[in-house]
Amino acid sequence: MAGVFRFSNAVSDIEKFIQTYRSIYEHFYPLTQTGHYFGHKEAYEFLATNGLASSLGAIGQEAIRRSERDDTSRDPLYNQHKMYSEIYRMLGWYEPGSMKTNFNLPEYGDYIAHSDPATVAKLFALNVLHIVSPNPLTRIKGGNILRPFPMIMKIMGALGGYLTRDEMIISVLACPDDRDDNYVSNVADKIRRIRKAGLKDLQAEIDSLKARVGINSKDALPNYTRFPIAAMKWTGWAEGVTTRDLYKGVSVTSLRITQSGEDVLQRISQAVDIRFEDILKYPCDAQAAFSIWSNLYQLKKVGFDISNYSEIIPQLESTAAPIFAEYRVKEYSDMLFFGYQEAPRDILKRGNQLIGE
């Protein structure tokens, strides 16, 4: 049985989260180009020294001194970067190094590091939509089969545009398999029943979930929502509101979908959703060609000029023809799949060989 999709408790300030990555990229990119990786220690020392991370009220070398523990799991600075790194990997901004605790900076990182703010905002929106489990680039605890952000949008759409934090926990983060065609309607019916019954029933559902997955801390489940709630607001897809309309006149805080969010919901509802595991049955070159094609497809939508690849794209489509045929990619108005974020590095490397890069 699937557990709870776990976002690390590191990120509620999306602007800082992005700027921190850009600083990390500029500092460590030359190192990674020599074939070396960087770990949590190198990263947090850089962040603390440059005032981008603090520990126990201090920055710089004093923060590093105060943070050091014999047990790194209790080291505040170590854990700050560890939690950032978990989401950077979900977004495709970090890729695995030689072990779980070190990292490489991918080709895609250059787009995040060097694009203008408006473009970075579009890329971030693209990336959060493509967070997925399972993912060959990172192990996401919980064992869910899930794209969490499209699921958030679909459930909001089914519930009149509103979703509270605890409702997000019991519906989105606890979703075992988003490919169940009945899941959204079933969980929306469940939440409507809970809203009618009152907040006690919502709390009972939370308590039941905690017991099932073995969580004792009262803060753990709410902490998993910090990033998705912040991202929904930062992208402009939702706004935070206080309302008495959901729970019998009781005032609760909730996300409310915006017109921008409605537009995204309509788009993803009409998209073909492909996961890397879907294309594993095809030859390596077909997987690679499709992954590279998806990168160009998504970057063009964001606004990048891909005209230099105009002669290569038909070759990629030919090599990946069985995938295009099975999933009827061109019959849909949109697609959910982004190779930079979802394909293994060896597949992208092979894809670059196919296009002569």
What are these regions (language model features)?
Residues 1-356:
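Donor-sugar nucleotide-binding helix/loop cap in glycosyltransferases
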